[in-house]
Amino acid sequence: MPKTPNGKLDRKSIAALLLRNAKRDMNGVVNDVEKMTVREGELRLLWERVLPTLGDLRLGPSSDFFMCGGNSMLLMKLQKAIKETTGIRVSTKDLYESSTLRAMTHCVFDRANRADDDAAPIDWAVETSLPASLQTQIQDLATSSPPEAGGHGTNGTEVLLTGATSFLGSHLLRSLLSSPRVKKVHCVAVPADEQATLFSHDTRIVCYSGTLLSPTLGVTPQERRTLEQSVHVIVHAGAHGHCLNRFDSLRAPNLQSLHFLATLALPRCVTILFLSSSRVVLLSGDTAPAPASMRSYPPAVDGKDGYTASKWAGEVFLENLVAHVENVASSASSPSVFWRSSLNVEVHRACTLVSESAPNSDAMNAILRHSLDMRCAPRLERAEGYLDFAPMESIVAKITVHAVEMATAVQQQQQQQQRQSQPPRDDAADGSPTERARGLRIAITLAVSSRPWATLGRIWRGRMVGDPKNWIYKSGL
């Protein structure tokens, strides 16, 4: 620090120091316009999640974790976030030795690349098959006595929801609570440090601490029995990762979590509503496919684009689950009363959801925001297909309606079966042999209109002349 001739701190000289230089030194950023790779950007999001508020400081490849406010405790929190997000285990020693964003990115993802080189090709038939424990449970339930009917009352619907603290899940939770027919929402697999974001003042919310990485999602045996007896519909909105993750790192949170939810649904054939991804349909090579099964279009066996692959695997697993239940129930000599109806499953592939509250990491919402700020539209010369946007509120309202209606239908059907103790008449037996027999419905939730890229660009530019923010966020695209 500058000093006076008397050896004291020179306050005037200190005040004249450029704050920008000091900020750059503290941040470890040598060049304000340093470009980041996609991997560095991915890790930066995790830094921003665990570090204290950075203010106007910008993280760059040369930023040092500890110079940006990090410490040993936050480094351990970052280590956990890396494991949960990417599935990569990295020691705190290696993270200490690679404290800049660029060095840490190489440390984490070079390790993953070496592991990927030794990985065997993925067998999708094995990945989407039913685990032996699940097959045993189905076989036992097919001939067992009916379970307790604690959840069959007529005083409202109880919903099991995963992903309640995510962008989509939080809006869906709010929508479910606004329905007068919803009695209670069981929020499962909520990380302990995110429970404060839930509406704790609402007594209809029951929170279960846990994570999708846990084989039981953190649910205790007693909590499991309660959920098996009470919930009427399971809405699986939770997921980890994105297209940069490999399937191996997302198998547990995105696919095996469905295995556990299936064990909860089976005793009373509780409806499962699975929120998949619109990217799954791209595996077919068709940019505007009909809402149908994608079983015939498996992902690549190298595990790349793991998020899409995990969602595809989840869809096909549910198809196999429903088919297996139907086969076992039809072959049982004296099936349980609850197994005389199909296990109902709905798969929803929602479009891009537009909301002013979307996180900065949401790429499409970020493009819309910057387009509004700059009053420019992106040039999409090589793009093909359609853009499907819709307001978040519109889509979650539709999902809520589907969830409540499916739960109500199952409640009424099972109440009637309890009274009559006779198999219900199947009026839809002549329907589609694939979709009807498996009790599976695939729904692609799209915006009101889908337009080709070129047409959409003209409409976009024209309507932005008026009130672009109102048009984008309230009316959908």
Swiss-Prot record:
One of its GO terms (molecular function) is transferase activity. SMART domains: PKS_PP (SM00823). Signal peptide: none annotated. Residues 161-322 are annotated as: Ketoreductase (KR) domain. Polyketide synthase-related protein; part of the gene cluster that mediates the biosynthesis of 10,11-dehydrocurvularin, a prevalent fungal phytotoxin with heat shock response and immune-modulatory activities. The highly reducing polyketide synthase Dhc3 is responsible for biosynthesis up to the tetraketide stage. The role of Dhc1 in 10,11-dehydrocurvularin biosynthesis has not been identified yet. InterPro entries: ACP-like_sf, Far_NAD-bd, NAD(P)-bd_dom_sf, PKS_PP-bd, PP-bd_ACP. Its EC number is 2.3.1.-. This is Polyketide synthase-related protein Dhc1. Gene3D superfamilies: ACP-like, NAD(P)-binding Rossmann-like Domain. PANTHER family: BETA-ALANINE-ACTIVATING ENZYME, CARRIER DOMAIN-CONTAINING PROTEIN. Residues 410-435 are annotated as: Disordered. Pfam families: NAD_binding_4, PP-binding. It comes from the Eukaryota. Residues 424-435 have a biased composition (Basic and acidic residues).
